[in-house]
Amino acid sequence: MQREFVSGAGLGLRRALLEPLGAGDEVRVDFLEVAPENWIGIGGRLGRQFRELTERLPFLCHGLSLNLGGYAPLDMSLLRAIKGFIEQHGIRAYSEHLSACADDGQLYDLMPLPFSDESVRRVAERVRVVQDVLERPLIVENVSAYARLPGELEEVDFVRAVLEEADCQLLLDVNNVYVNACNFGFDAHAYIAAMPSRRIAYLHMAGHDEQGASLKIDTHGAPVCDPVWELLAHAYACHGERPTLLERDFNLPPLSELYAETDRIRELQRRSGEAQLRSLGYGT
């Protein structure tokens, strides 16, 4: 039986956070997210600590290596392992990147896709296969990029087409929208507004690195910047409050600093909820 989805503000779980999160009775986030590839088969002390957290908090999985946009056959053994992991730990949902990461071997990076009708059809077919194997919906994420491949579609139209063709949900990564808007010169606000509200499952927030004035790199290694916070508020205004998760992969600060960012997410969610009530004639 599929469990209820998550709500509120979440945090990406990294191994360095196991001890701090498990040290006290109070965990100030509403859910956690992990890459299943990093935890499948982990036992011993780390495995016990991980299990303790999955028994205390709702969890999501965010995959790294399914290669949804690639041409190589889907890794069915990996898919079956992910399915077992999801069932073992009561994971609420599974998401993957709209990218390619393998071609006659693992590329160890998330490569951009051509925004073409052919890519839409290929990716949608692979998404449907994944959903059939996992026996649950798949959530796909818009990715950051630093080069464009030839294609007749704009990124926003490509993402929308995949969602409709595959009949799947979206993990809207707000920082990735900002990074790509800066790198390729499109309107981040219009992109977010154009996403279909009924398809948006949850959101990601993260920091990035600036390589000069014209290039931004999605690193997950810095605090969220003010323009990305503003885009999150815009996303809530367009689509309503959604569960939102903070990613931080390296340069990890004390847990209190990460909590400050997840608290800020909650505050924006609260304001969004109040604005929605006012629009319906409640409150002042």
Swiss-Prot record:
Record's protein name: UPF0276 protein PA14_21580
Origin superkingdom: Bacteria
Protein family (similarity comment): Belongs to the UPF0276 family.
One protein family per Pfam: MbnB_TglH_ChrH
Organism: Pseudomonas aeruginosa (strain UCBPP-PA14)
Gene3D superfamilies per record: Divalent-metal-dependent TIM barrel enzymes
Taxonomic classification: Bacteria, Pseudomonadati, Pseudomonadota, Gammaproteobacteria, Pseudomonadales
